[in-house]
Amino acid sequence: MGHANIWYSHPRRYGQGSRSCRACSNRHGLIRKYGLNICRQCFREYAHDIGFKKLD
């Protein structure tokens, strides 16, 4: 059994390791509210395109 077979072979069905950003596949700073599943960096980039408006 080589290294490639062992690496990342554990099932990830729940927890932080199971979810990733739909834009950049990052796993940190994920916004899951409203089913966005997008990291905070990508959210700042795509918020206007999604339909979020910044209030004064």
Curated annotation (Swiss-Prot):
One of its GO terms (cellular component) is cytosolic small ribosomal subunit. Keywords: Cytoplasm, Endoplasmic reticulum, Metal-binding, Ribonucleoprotein, Ribosomal protein, Zinc. It is found in: Cytoplasm, Cytosol; Cytoplasm; Rough endoplasmic reticulum. Its cofactor is Zn(2+). Zn(2+) binds at C21, C24, C39, C42. One of its GO terms (molecular function) is zinc ion binding. GO terms for biological process: cytoplasmic translation. Binds 1 zinc ion per subunit. NCBIfam families: PRK05766.1. Belongs to the universal ribosomal protein uS14 family. Component of the 40S small ribosomal subunit. This is Small ribosomal subunit protein uS14. It comes from Spodoptera frugiperda (Fall armyworm).
